[in-house]
């Protein structure tokens, strides 16, 4: 791999002026319009790549430390903004005097162009995200002007050929440089590269050929979507130009929170409080789920902060609604702050019997249940 300093013929401590002087000298020597040798164009590109890497202080520092790998192979032709407009001139040479840019060519601007994609943010309820729904939305987008049918010209008229460029969309001018006289190709300033001008614009769209209108769409929200889910509605973006295809509409989902339920992925979480008697003896309680109220069995001896699961009561998996997650219920046990005399007598009697049956244990009934010694 060639060293950039060697390519330019300078030392590694060369300053910016030395680099520029060396580059100009070599660029003139190897420019393919001046030097007809078979390898001149490749050499000219190599010189440009080396100068671009070393002309920028940050890029040069990375190159000095890591070599060409440190600049990611991103070096190409240098920014010629401070060299009297040579950049546009060299761009013309490398594209065969066709007036095409490195982004694909001005000729493409005159052909069909795809319309822009659009974004629409949609807030939906918690349950609607679980089970899906159809929603009607109203979006603003660009459509072809019905009056001029997209021409931009007043009805009964049409675009005319640009007299400045003769319909080519490009203008040429002679430029004197240290390399000699060259012809520079640029976008026509009169028609902006289109090749046609509209003398009598359409009053409905102002000569643009498109108008912003609001359109009602009915979209299908699949079961299992979540905040951040992006839905693509094909062909509902802005209209394309000159017969190009329309863009797409992207609907970004934002799911509202629920006061009782929380969601993590395909599972749903909630809490329930039961009395200490329900925890000890067991019970059946009603639980609010996305499917409505369902019965949840509290097994006898349920410990505080344990989790019980309702299978297949969670969120359908996006793209496979038959497969659902679970609803996880965190059980909180409520301890009474006050008890009646009768309740105390019953509990003490129970504690006494429990202690007799478990005399070898160092802890009593209340210790096991509530963390207190009996």
Swiss-Prot record:
HAMAP family hit by this protein: DnaJ (MF_01152)
Entries under PANTHER family matching the protein: CHAPERONE PROTEIN DNAJ A6, CHLOROPLASTIC, DNAJ HOMOLOG 1, MITOCHONDRIAL-RELATED
CR-type zinc-finger residues: 132-214
Annotated Zn(2+) 1 binding sites: 145, 148, 202, 205
PROSITE patterns attached to this UniProt entry: DNAJ_1, DNAJ_2, ZF_CR
Domain J: from-to ranges: 3-67
SUPFAM superfamilies the UniProt entry points to: Chaperone J-domain (SSF46565), DnaJ/Hsp40 cysteine-rich domain (SSF57938), HSP40/DnaJ peptide-binding domain (SSF49493)
Principal location listed in the UniProt entry: cytoplasm
GO cellular component, one term: cytoplasm
Name of this protein: Chaperone protein DnaJ
Disordered: annotated span: 99-118
